[in-house]
Amino acid sequence: MEQTRTGKASGAGNGRVIMHLDMDAFFVNVELLENPALRGEPIIVAPLGPRSVVCSASYEARAHGVRSGMPLSRARNLSPNATVLPLRGDYRHYSRAVMAILNDLSPYVEQVSVDEAFVDLTGAYLHGQDPVALAQRARDRIAQELSLPSSAGVAPNKLLAKMASTGSKPNGLWVIPPERVQEFLDPRKVSDLWGVGAKSTEQLSRYGIHTIAQMRSMSLDWLKERFGAAQGEHLWAMARGIDERPVITEREEKSMGGEHTFETDTTDAQEVSAAIRELSLKLGKRLRSVGKLAGGLSLKIRYSTFETHTRAIALNVPVDSGMQIASLALEALRVDEIVVGQTVPRALRLIGVRAEKLARAEDGVQQTLFDSIQSGVNPRSAQTASATASTQRGSGGAGKSFGNGVRSGSGARSGSGARLVKSGRWSEVEHVMDAIHRRYSSESLKPASGVVAPEQKVEERVEQKAEQKVEEGN
């Protein structure tokens, strides 16, 4: 049943008005369009397989404790009668349709995920319209045109709008007028504040602070002293419902990447290497498709115990080559002794590769061989010049270690990464492959599985690092 909660019948006042709209159990409800007979039953949407995690759960399944991100095996134990549906719906189609409806309301729409967005409705007053009525109209259109339920919050800022939409679920609308902000916030738990995680909640609890009202009673100096200047000011502002962040209509990606969950926990270095290579090639292709270069990389590893670590790899030369990314990632795993020889000492459940510090390709690196061919520049001259530029800049090394493994400086010029940047020319090769794929098909040309740069042993890498430090000391 739809619910509407508001502090007064009309809008949120004549100040800033932000709506947060969140689709209810989005993946589940898209699947129900094809399986309406399952409506009202506990449903779990997840990829089929022994290592799957829950993507979405119906409210009937949530009543049994099932949550998104939970291992499917655990979800089955909590809700044994739940129907498990694989990911098969056209989620992007429905997501685009929802965003199109929101863009009809206002030009200021910030999509934050496939099923939620912020909308700045402040301009409605200029046209004599009620922002709350517009929010309800959007929900009505989504229900009528797409047969999907949604929840929304309307408030003076993004923080409050997000909290209101969460509180209105399922299928509701909650309006927070400016004069009732503290009435809304004070009785709630500090963990209900958007952005306050488990660590901050635990710290506040140690001081006897459990509600937002209790946190609001603390002075700014008290909060800064215990949580640091930035976090202290953030907590102080949130307790008063202060959030000045604008609705960002065009969000430029700051990072991109992917993860791979092994079918069974693995200690096989070849299996890990194959996963890294596949992730890296996909990542490189994605970078090139949007004209971006990675200024840094990060690796994510999850052991069989669910212990999770990330590791940064700093780069002196931006990359968009999947083969270069794979080589640098594998080198980092060996240096940190995540991979030793042909084995992995601690069984891995998941591996991930991410590109960070993204920059436009035209800002970051020399002209590629393919570009020079397209523009009529002598390919041999272009290749020689770009190889020289690569040699002068050197290669990116590894950054912060996963654990107690060997540390590797960000300015290293040796190692497999440097050889690839200086002599492998993988970026040019992969740009040419992209062009062939666009003209013919993705199956027309593939890299040979064995085409990788020769890798250094960890001992050689450490020895070179020691020599480099001696040279720097002299």
Model-inferred region functions:
Residues 125-129, 358-364:
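Short, charged/polar, Gly/Pro-enriched secondary-structure boundary elements
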Residues 1-234, 247, 285, 376-380, ...:
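Gly/Gly-Pro- and Ser/Thr-rich, intrinsically disordered tail segments characteristic of DNA damage-repair
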Residues 112-116, 155-158, 292-296, 346-350:
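Short Gly/Ser/Thr- and Asp/Glu-enriched loop/turn motifs at secondary-structure junctions
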Residues 120-122, 261-269, 313-322, 386, ...:
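Short histidine-centered catalytic/ligand-binding loop motif
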Residues 11, 192, 200-348, 360-366, ...:
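DNA-contacting surface of Y-family translesion DNA polymerases
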